[in-house]
Amino acid sequence: MSKRLLLAGMIACCLAMPVVILAADKPPKKGASVKAVKAMSVQEQTALALSAAPPHISKDAGVMVFGEDGKLTEARKSANGFTCIPTVMNLPAPDPMCMDAAVQQWVTDLTNNAPKPTNTVPGIAYMARGGSHFEKGGQVVMSGEGAKNVSEPPHWMLMWPFDAAGTKLPIAPNPSGVYIMFEGTPYAHLMVYQDPRKMK
């Protein structure tokens, strides 16, 4: 499964390093570039990656970090089916994500421009530091061309083909904290604006 995460960087160990963990708990530096994340040590990248998930997930999760060649490589094997990476879009700050095997497949399919995701079960992904998405004309879109970048709060995702017509769920961020991202595409999925760090 780790090979699937060598997917163009998805742009798309720290249990023995408490000092590094504390550093990763600080707010991410605004304007940080992917290059800056890649320049971090393995320990720093590991701490950043693991900060994406609830403690009961991150403690046994695998970790992928950027190597000297700029590609993601396995730094720690997963003992619970989840794998964490130090950043995704990095706009405007590091946005680590921790995902299960189904989401890894989903991401691989998206990166490879597959017609639709091929995961056969719903996938779960955590982004406890928040992230960002593109909006154009008041709608969340997949491409950044001509769109504005909008920051997102801490959240988790359910990668499964949700349909707004059938579920009656919103298709844009709203006060309820739940919406379908990429509605109308095969990659539609559920966004839940709930802080993973508060999950027990």
Question: Where does each model-flagged region fall?
Answer:
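Bacterial N-terminal signal peptides
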Residues: 9-18
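Sec/Tat signal peptide C-region and signal peptidase I cleavage site
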Residues: 19-23
